[in-house]
Amino acid sequence: MFTIDFSDHTGLVKDAWYKQIEDLLEFAKKEEHIEDDAELSVTFVDKQEIQEINRTYRDKDKVTDVISFALEEDEPEIDFSGLDIPRVLGDIIICTDVAQEQANNYGHSFERELGFLALHGFLHLLGYDHMTEADEKEMFGRQDTILNAYGLTRG
């Protein structure tokens, strides 16, 4: 089982889009060979709220498109097999204002950009990062592979 708790603080995300994001992340979970039951949250916020979160928790006083808080970060890997509890991956926070701007810049739909950002945040929850050039190449390559296999491409 894969549980995703959605929360929209903006009122801009259509109910049907939750299903697309859920399907994409379920696909990504399989692609990443996560067989355990898992749980995460996806919250949609505006620029003001994401800047406040970024400032408070990351010491970066600026707006961004997506922030992820991995619950397993810097923790030893835990074997959940045999336990009747889900693996709690963490929280993904997406700024709908920035998502709309990026969708316009890339020439694709707002819905599609939300999918890209949700997957990007999901990969962060799994430990991918882009702090170095090598890490960026690995993460973005993985992101593109999953998006292409799922059929959600830019443009």
From Swiss-Prot:
It comes from the Bacteria. Transmembrane segments: none annotated. Gene3D superfamilies: Metalloproteases ('zincins'), catalytic domain. GO terms for biological process: rRNA processing. Keywords: Cytoplasm, Endonuclease, Hydrolase, Metal-binding, Nuclease, Ribosome biogenesis, rRNA processing, Zinc. Binds 1 zinc ion. Pfam families: YbeY. PROSITE patterns: UPF0054. It is an enzyme of class 3 (hydrolase). GO terms for molecular function: metalloendopeptidase activity; RNA endonuclease activity; zinc ion binding. GO terms for cellular component: cytoplasm. It is found in: Cytoplasm. InterPro entries: MetalPrtase_cat_dom_sf_prd (IPR023091), YbeY (IPR002036), YbeY_CS (IPR020549). Its main location: cytoplasm. Its EC number is 3.1.-.-. SUPFAM superfamilies: Metalloproteases ('zincins'), catalytic domain. Zn(2+) binds at residues 120, 124, 130. Its cofactor is Zn(2+). Single strand-specific metallo-endoribonuclease involved in late-stage 70S ribosome quality control and in maturation of the 3' terminus of the 16S rRNA. Belongs to the endoribonuclease YbeY family. This is Endoribonuclease YbeY. The gene is ybeY.
